[in-house]
Amino acid sequence: MMKTLVVVLSLSLTILSFGGAHAATISFKNNCPYMVWPGTLTSDQKPQLSTTGFELASQASFQLDTPVPWNGRFWARTGCSTDASGKFVCATADCASGQVMCNGNGAIPPATLAEFNIPAGGGQDFYDVSLVDGFNLPMSVTPQGGTGDCKTASCPANVNAVCPSELQKKGSDGSVVACLSACVKFGTPQYCCTPPQNTPETCPPTNYSEIFHNACPDAYSYAYDDKRGTFTCNGGPNYAITFCP
């Protein structure tokens, strides 16, 4: 009986150890001088996270574990409040759920995104900071541990300061609170890399995407910015996401 118990206990510990070996812990830090409300979105058919939205005060931190495999994105909403009807609304990157939790809704552009593809078994992770849906605040993604390149993906600059007038999203006080991407603004194949311009050869960078790239060379600036915007790390690292790095 004792021998059987030892075997069962040993097997249970092995399963627990294996099950958690490659789960990624995502650490969030808000270095912005204002409150943000991060949102999470899991891609279809992937395990869901424990929360889809939360509040993060200036200088506050938060941790979230991802199951594996996992594919999804994070962003931060700004200028949020509860209106007279009790609906939670945000000035930028709102997910239109009416709540702090996004409940499966993505960010309404413009929004700076942190995107992840984390495989099972400690394989090669892919991650990026994307401005394909526009920009609303600076952000960085830094692997913690892991092997290989494991470089920081980031957009530390305030792109709003160099945003062309035709792409600007303004707040109620007239200030620029976010910067639309050309795809979101104009919706044409030239900027969205949709047919008939749906290959890297037929959809090169544009003057608008180069504004994003020049401000944030370590971020995805448009749909086919794979060589400049995609980062990899092996060995099951954890990640630190910093708002206003």
Curated annotation (Swiss-Prot):
Tissue expression remark: Abundantly expressed in ripening fruit.
Subcellular compartments: Secreted
Reactions listed under catalytic activity: Hydrolysis of (1->3)-beta-D-glucosidic linkages in (1->3)-beta-D-glucans
A Pfam cross-reference name: Thaumatin
Molecular function via GO: glucan endo-1,3-beta-D-glucosidase activity; IgE binding
CDD domains xrefs: TLP-PA
EC number: 3.2.1.39
Gene Ontology cellular-component annotations: extracellular region
Keywords annotated in UniProt: Allergen, Disulfide bond, Glycosidase, Hydrolase, IgE-binding protein, Secreted, Signal
Disulfide feature: 32-244, 80-90, 95-102, 150-233, 155-216, 163-179, 183-192, 193-203
Signal peptide: 1-23
Enzyme class: hydrolase
Gene3D superfamilies: Thaumatin
InterPro entries tied to this protein: Osmotin/thaumatin-like_sf, Thaumatin, Thaumatin_CS
Highest taxon in the source lineage: Eukaryota
Family classification: Belongs to the thaumatin family.
Note: Most abundant soluble protein in ripe cherries.
Stated name of the protein: Glucan endo-1,3-beta-glucosidase
Native species: Prunus avium
